[in-house]
């Protein structure tokens, strides 16, 4: 089954959106496999966003991510990477549809509440970085009510 990495950024944590965001993924039928509240240092944030290191907004992004605790999560389910991105909404909240997390809770691109893996391969890399200890192996008793 496919897995994705989801991070509630410092603004989402500070604004008390953790439960709401977790609820959206649970209600969709995805299974939470890993969860931690953590404040990361600059080196870790730079490693996570290394693919963006040449962008002019890189330093501001890193400063933002290290400004407070984040909630790092691993979610599992059929098509969870693609569907997770749809639940999250467009990177720019002003382009996000109402009903998406960013469409409902964010205004500025620099405070867009949440990160989600953009592909299966990036999800694997991000999960390995954030959860080197591995994640929980379990199956919900609702699995047969969600999947054929």
Curated annotation (Swiss-Prot):
In Gene Ontology terms, what is a biological process of this protein?
CTP biosynthetic process
Superkingdom of this protein's organism: Eukaryota
What EC identifiers does the entry list?
2.7.4.6
Q: Where does ATP bind?
A: 9, 57, 85, 91, 102, 112
- The catalytic residues are 115
**Keyword field contains Chloroplast:** no
Q: Which family does it belong to?
A: Belongs to the NDK family.
Q: Which NCBIfam families match?
A: PRK00668.1
Q: HAMAP family recorded for this chain?
A: NDP_kinase (MF_00451)
| Protein name per the record | Nucleoside diphosphate kinase 1
């Amino acid at each position: 089954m496919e897995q994705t990495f989801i991070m509630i950024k410092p603004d989402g944590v500070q604004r008390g959106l953790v439960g709401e965001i977790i609820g959206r993924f649970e209600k969709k039928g995805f299974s939470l496999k890993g969860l931690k509240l953590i404040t990361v240092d600059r080196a870790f944030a730079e490693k996570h966003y290394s693919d963006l290191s040449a962008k002019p907004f890189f330093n501001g992004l890193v400063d933002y991510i290290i400004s407070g605790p984040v909630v790092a999560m691993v979610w599992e389910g059929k098509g969870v990477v693609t569907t997770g991105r749809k639940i999250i909404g467009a990177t720019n909240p002003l382009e996000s549809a109402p009903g998406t997390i960013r469409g409902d809770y964010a205004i500025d691109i620099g405070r867009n509440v949440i990160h989600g893996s953009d592909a299966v391969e990036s999800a694997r890399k991000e999960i390995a970085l954030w959860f080197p200890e591995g994640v929980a192996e379990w199956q919900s008793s609702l699995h047969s009510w969600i999947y054929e």
